[in-house]
Amino acid sequence: MTNQLEGKIAVVTGGSQGIGRAIAECMVNSGAKVIVGDKNPIESTNLHWHLLDVTNENSVKEFAKQTIDNHGPVNILVNNAGIMTNSPLIEQSVEEWDQVMAVNLRGPFLMAKHLVPLMDISQSPAIINIGSIEGISGNPNHSAYMASKAGVHGLTASMAIDLGPKGIRVNAIAPGWINTELNQGYLDGVPDQEAAQKELVKLHPIGHIGKPSDVGDTAVWLASAQSRFVTGQVIKVEGGRMSQLSLPSIFNKEH
């Protein structure tokens, strides 16, 4: 355990499971007091929870009030709450599209709008938005998700410019394939999971799939003084997946 975030108060949206839960736990282990904002209650002895619907402005306002009243000024905001759909473009409903945009893009906007005025500027606050490598490159049937995450990356740059003069740093993390409950759900639908796992590993030059704590540790760094001159960036946490150009197997040679 390190104390990089000792005395800091952090908010993590969508922190009941997966990457969000890992970020929350990594920050607690680094000395922060962490408030999880989520629709779903959490069972934890070291995390605090308040009800939050990031798509609803009144809910965000109430969450901000509860956080300040019960815990004090926020130093760190992690906009992690997100959803994904898996629909071909022409089959995707407008309602489905709007819901993805509401959670993934409207949510970070509303959280920043109502939490930034309540931040403790003297403590070098930081905002971390969770994007995705799918906001940079393409995958089939994920048009709403990809568009929303590209929007998160753009929002991050704009927020960094707007909030920099206030002393607030803003960065995004773009995770690749991380071993979460959500991604395991995709694997559960594959007949040969062992073969699928091997193929996934091949996509990563580093030789293994990421863990939620890999993203959590990156978030701790971005929230800490060690990254004090880093802002407006999208940090890819993807094991080198986007660094390699895959060629057909006929080009592979054994040495």
What does each model-identified segment do?
Residues 117, 161-165, 228:
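Alpha-helical segment proximal to the catalytic Tyr-Lys
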